[in-house]
From Swiss-Prot:
Belongs to the class-I aminoacyl-tRNA synthetase family. TyrS type 1 subfamily. This is Tyrosine--tRNA ligase. The keyword Transport does not apply. SUPFAM superfamilies: Alpha-L RNA-binding motif, Nucleotidylyl transferase. It is found in: Cytoplasm. It is an enzyme of class 6 (ligase). The gene is tyrS. It holds the Pfam family SYY_C-terminal. One of its GO terms (cellular component) is cytosol. Its EC number is 6.1.1.1. It comes from Bifidobacterium animalis subsp. lactis (strain AD011). It catalyses: tRNA(Tyr) + L-tyrosine + ATP = L-tyrosyl-tRNA(Tyr) + AMP + diphosphate + H(+).
């Protein structure tokens, strides 16, 4: 697994200094008070994760990494999984969320707990504490909620929150359900303050309005100043919100995004993003990150920083062994590593998924073939050649490979043993052009 170190080993005077250097703080409550809080005795802090999907994504990973930094510094993490707020849904930039059934929310809550537990320490002297806001929200009746909590919220302040104001001015407006979300989140912080002496809440900067609702509530009803710390919305080299792959979120669940594709996402990041991503998504010390950034400038072709980044993040999320399999599969695909036949079917399917071709209906599918088909025809079907004559010519010149074995005869047929796991044949033209056919 990726090596996790605390701020002292990383060469910083405090964990707050390190988080700032890594670009993980965009705004916070009073900085001096926050520094005093984090530089003193260990405190409880929390971050909430709503089950709006069956998996967390790399936007959530930023929060988990911040939580792990604070945990390594000795502070006590509380991971709140939104069993109650997940039934309500926080306001989005546009459109109401679809409310999921309670049983689905419960299932997703459990899946999120497993993912969170894979990043944060669950054993030892400072394990993460898991809570669900359903436990204290479901038992509160409407009258108590309005008298004890709602009384402390001013509607004028609530409608001035950025997302709420935007939704109010839109055609679809905002429901009372989503409008009330910030009150529920504020009550969460109050509950955790009362029962765990929690004095710091974490979240993304796009949630600043919701984050400060608890801050204000605690000040009003307990007369105490607590803290909020928000991370920036990380963007890519083009200024777009980071973490989208072909329009889809980069999920942490390997059943929603394979380990191989997750690894490739990080491996394919451009040079210009290396400094910010190594700081934000790895626990590497400052000196090592600076060395990797310098290596990118002096020898970009080696892509050392990308390989280190991909290893560190993938092994952190998925573990060492699955990450090694993803790396080995990638190398085997181009004949630079082990035997393709040694790759398990799940990894093989994931590796080859990007080699699908478009059918007449515009769908991405595997090209089809059977034992006894000519390799030249298979190459055309897989999109490596425009014609059979072109395929034969390339075979004759020694430039075509089946499962990394050079094809010697332009009339050669596919054999039953050529189908890896009885399913796939990997075709290669030259050093880099790949194609695949699947048994029909």
């Amino acid at each position: 697994m990726a090596h996790v170190i605390d701020f002292k080993e990383a060469g910083f005077d405090s964990v707050l200094d390190e988080l700032e250097w890594r670009g993980l703080i965009s705004q916070s409550t009073d900085r001096d008070r926050l520094a005093h809080t984090l530089n003193g005795e260990p405190v409880h802090y929390y971050c909430g994760f709503d089950p709006t999907a069956p998996s967390l994504h790399i936007g959530n990973l930023v929060q988990l990494i911040i939580m792990r930094h604070l945990q390594e510094a000795g502070h006590h993490p509380i991971a709140l999984v939104g069993g109650a707020t997940g039934l309500i849904g926080d306001p989005r930039q546009s459109g109401e969320r679809i409310l999921n059934p309670k049983d689905i929310v419960e299932q997703w809550c459990e899946r999120l707990r497993i993912q969170i537990g894979g990043i944060l320490e669950q054993e030892g002297s400072n394990p993460v504490t898991f809570v669900s806001n359903y436990d204290w929200t479901a038992t509160m009746n409407v009258l108590d909620f309005l008298r004890d909590i709602g009384k402390n919220f001013r509607v004028g302040t609530m409608i001035s929150k950025d997302i709420v104001a935007r939704r109010l001015n839109s055609e679809e407006g905002i429901s009372f359900t989503e409008f009330s979300y910030q009150v529920l989140q504020g009550n969460d912080y109050l509950y955790l303050y009362d029962h765990y002496d929690c004095v710091l809440e974490l979240g993304g900067s796009d949630q600043w309005g919701n984050l400060t609702s608890g801050l204000d509530l605690i000040h009003k009803v307990r007369g105490v100043n607590v803290n909020v710390m928000a991370s920036p919305i990380i963007t890519d080299a083009n200024g777009k919100k980071f973490g989208k792959s072909e329009g889809n979120a980069v999920w942490l669940d390997p059943n929603m995004l394979s380990v191989y594709k997750f690894y490739q996402f990080w491996l394919n990041r451009p040079d210009v993003e290396m400094a910010s991503l190594l700081k934000a998504f790895t626990f590497l010390p400052k000196a090592e990150i600076e060395r990797l950034v310098e290596a990118t400038d002096t020898n970009p072709g080696a892509r050392e920083a990308q390989r280190v980044l991909a290893w560190e993040v993938t092994s952190l999320v998925h573990g060492d062994e699955p990450t090694r399999k993803a790396i080995d599969a990638s190398a085997s695909l181009f004949g630079r590593g082990g035997d393709l036949a040694d790759i398990d079917l799940e990894t093989l399917e994931s590796v080859l998924d990007g080699l699908k071709v478009e059918n007449e209906a515009g769908e991405k599918v595997f090209a089809q073939a059977l034992p006894g088909d000519r390799i030249a025809q298979a190459g055309v079907s897989a999109g490596l050649f425009k014609s059979i004559s072109e395929a034969r010519k390339t075979i004759k010149s020694g430039g075509v490979y089946v499962n990394n074995v050079r094809v010697e005869d332009e009339e050669q047929l596919l054999g039953d043993g050529d189908f890896l796991k009885g399913r796939f044949v990997v075709l290669r033209r030259g050093k880099k052009a790949l194609g695949v056919v699947a048994r029909s």
